[in-house]
């Protein structure tokens, strides 16, 4: 069972004002241990506990115990939703071989949970700032009752793979054909277009130059102008960034499927790896939602994107749109490991999870005892601040 540890030495150091050093924590406590610091003001708004509905390997659960009035002065419009960034008043420091998934946790008995959603988030081991969640909710929502907003901090054990991507550009000569298909039955209700493009080479589409066409699909030649689709990562980063190899155009409220010309190769050294694609925090905050999904071995990199910015946009060639996490197959997350998902805000059912056997270590001095990191407190798109990769083509 996961064990929540509060070291009495840490409490004494904080209460007396004594200097504290990392040597206070024995080395044996640092392996498979996630440091957590709960801010004092958290008690006023959130309950922060280990989930007692899980018998072993418990995730950290955060739940509002006060009514949340909406929309607040911090809310902004995102397509047909409001969006608000919520500080969860918690800091974390996992080992480099772990990451935390931030996931909404639902109890099926609470019907109003279908009116507000939490964007899936990935917390890197190197992030030392206060963790925030992105809350999306429908315009008719004016209040979230106590206990109705529940969020998991869900640890996952990362794996390394020296054979992560197999670039197939040379096999495509170097043109890759996209396929447009009829929208799925569970596409968003406000979906306007008759087809879902996998590539968005809008100029080619508008010129009407399909190579093959029948009642269901047609193919378009898309020239690739950028070859570095998968970026390398720092040791403390959770995922490998996925870049778009062409200018990607999305109309407001458009819901598209993207297929990239790169295959996840089988890794004979580490066959017990599951790969999952998640969005990046900077894009989720701006309203560009990457639907979290699995990336099965032997298949092209595929995922859905939902434009909730409220504008027509262009994502530039080479922009980091998503990220892929390589997760130990023994970690059972809220996504199926072999299914392409088109759900914008997937959630976990409370009590049904399979996280690795980690120890939560609660402290009031995380900044003093945590391993130094390159990223520090910079979060929510800090690595994108020097670039403007998204053009808003039409203002409303």
Curated annotation (Swiss-Prot):
It catalyses: dUTP + H2O = dUMP + diphosphate + H(+). GO terms for molecular function: dUTP diphosphatase activity; metal ion binding. One of its GO terms (biological process) is dUTP metabolic process. It is an enzyme of class 3 (hydrolase). Its cofactor is Mg(2+). InterPro entries: dUTPase-like, dUTPase-like_sf, HSV_DUT. It comes from the Viruses. Substrate binds at residues 280-282, 380-381. Its EC number is 3.6.1.23. HAMAP family: HSV_DUT (MF_04031). Belongs to the dUTPase family. Involved in nucleotide metabolism: produces dUMP, the immediate precursor of thymidine nucleotides and decreases the intracellular concentration of dUTP to avoid uracil incorporation into viral DNA. This is Deoxyuridine 5'-triphosphate nucleotidohydrolase.
């Amino acid at each position: 069972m996961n064990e929540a540890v509060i070291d009495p030495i840490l409490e004494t150091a904080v209460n007396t004002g004594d200097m504290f050093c990392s040597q206070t924590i024995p080395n044996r406590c640092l392996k498979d241990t996630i440091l957590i610091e709960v801010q004092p003001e958290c008690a006023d708004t959130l309950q922060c506990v280990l989930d007692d509905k899980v018998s072993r390997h418990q995730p950290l659960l955060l739940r509002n115990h006060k009514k949340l009035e909406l929309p607040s002065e911090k809310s902004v419009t995102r397509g047909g939703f409001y969006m608000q960034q919520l500080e969860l008043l918690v800091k974390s420091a996992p080992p480099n071989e772990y990451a935390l998934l931030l996931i909404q946790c639902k109890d099926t008995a609470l019907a109003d949970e279908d009116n507000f959603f939490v964007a899936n988030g990935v917390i890197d081991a190197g992030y030392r700032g206060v963790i925030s969640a992105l809350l999306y909710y429908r315009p008719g929502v004016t209040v979230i009752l106590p206990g109705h907003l529940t969020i998991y901090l869900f640890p996952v054990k990362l794996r390394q793979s020296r054979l992560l991507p197999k670039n197939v550009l040379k096999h495509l000569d170097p043109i890759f054909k996209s396929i447009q298909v009829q929208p799925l039955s569970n596409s968003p209700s406000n979906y306007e277009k008759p087809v879902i493009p996998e590539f968005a080479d809008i100029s080619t589409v508008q010129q009407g130059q399909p190579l093959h066409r029948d009642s269901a699909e047609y193919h378009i030649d898309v020239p690739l102008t950028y070859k570095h689709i998968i970026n390398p990562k720092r040791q403390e980063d959770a995922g490998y960034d996925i870049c778009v190899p062409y200018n990607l155009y999305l109309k407001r409220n458009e819901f598209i499927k993207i297929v990239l010309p790169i295959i996840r190769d089988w890794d004979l050294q580490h066959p017990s790896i599951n790969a999952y694609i998640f969005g990046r925090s900077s894009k989720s905050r701006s309203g560009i939602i990457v639907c979290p999904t699995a990336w099965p071995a032997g298949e092209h990199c595929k995922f859905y994107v939902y434009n909730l910015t409220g504008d027509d946009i262009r994502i530039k060639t080479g922009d980091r749109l998503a990220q892929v996490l390589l997760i130990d197959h023994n970690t059972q997350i809220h996504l199926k490991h072999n299914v392409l998902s088109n759900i914008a805000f997937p959630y976990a059912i409370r009590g049904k999870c399979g996280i690795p056997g980690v120890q939560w270590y609660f402290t009031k001095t995380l900044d003093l005892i945590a391993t130094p990191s390159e990223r520090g407190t910079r979060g929510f798109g800090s690595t994108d601040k020097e670039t403007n990769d998204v053009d808003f083509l039409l203002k409303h």
